[in-house]
Amino acid sequence: MTFDENISRILVKDKEYEMPFSKGLLARSLTAAGMKPSESYTLAREIERDLNEQNVLKISKDELRRRVYYTLINRDYEGIGEKYLLWRRVLKKHSIIILVGGSSGVGTSTIAFELASRLGIPSVIGTDSIREVMRRSISKDLVPMLYESSYTAWTALRRSQWDEQDTKEMHLLGFERHVEPVLLGIESIIDRSLTEGTSVIIEGTHIVPGLMGEKYQSMPNVIFLNLTLSSEETHKKRFTARAKVSDRPLERYLENFEIIKEINQYIVEKSKENKVPVIENVSISETVQKCLEIVTERFSNLNDEPIIDSDMY
């Protein structure tokens, strides 16, 4: 029997659907659990080879996970095996909401999409998109700060407020007024995800610990992460790189860089006050790994079953 080498003849069965076995998907899951990418793909290829040699044409997702786990154990990857099963089990039973915050240019969208890919979470929502939705329901006359960028929102404050604040306080007050209506949209998405049992990653400048509802801080399946960049040079280079692949004007960011720095420091301080992890996002791979470690620790608190069921072979 012949088959396309790029499309596996092995079907993986779930309750509602069947799909071809994917070495790439399995390798991604193993990498998320801490295995090196090259090793994860090699192991995924070996598992596919073993299934073909045993003439397995259909296999349930649970059975495949058992095989992967015991293969990892036999290769002395016990820790990775436990993480692999933990993530699959928790994501199957619980809705997971990961909130990735940070000021403009620190890389929240990049890290959010990397985490979504590793964890198999299908939905990533940027807070800029939520802001656009809120603009359609709230008039500019009512909340003019919403119609500005996070770092220019202070210019929409009433003139009387300018006299009451020093410059930095005015910048941060404008930022807070800009963020507040967007938080309503963020909280609505979280509530809906929890109700419907779906997982989502939300990323962007508008995620500020301490400004969101307190109830979310105590929810074990709502995970806050904050990214930062201490190096001004690195931060500015991120804006330069962004300008090359988007229509966002570099000059606008650089002209307002001092305010962006103030906002960054404000979010970091709020994160520390609320015991939210602050991660220096210099290396994407290292940041993703640190985030995954934090997420794994939270997953452990959600998992109320032994890693391996007693009926596993």
Curated annotation (Swiss-Prot):
GO molecular function, one term: ATP binding
Keyword ATP-binding: yes
InterPro entries for the chain: 2PKG (IPR020872), ATP-cone_dom (IPR005144), P-loop_NTPase (IPR027417)
Pathway where this protein functions: Thermoadapter biosynthesis; cyclic 2,3-diphosphoglycerate biosynthesis; cyclic 2,3-diphosphoglycerate from 2-phospho-D-glycerate: step 1/2
Cofactor(s) listed: a divalent metal cation
Function text: Catalyzes the phosphorylation of 2-phosphoglycerate to 2,3-diphosphoglycerate. Involved in the biosynthesis of cyclic 2,3-bisphosphoglycerate, a thermoprotectant.
Protein name: 2-phosphoglycerate kinase
Originating species: Methanococcus maripaludis (strain C5 / ATCC BAA-1333)
Organism phylogeny: Archaea, Methanobacteriati, Methanobacteriota, Methanomada group, Methanococci
Gene: pgk2
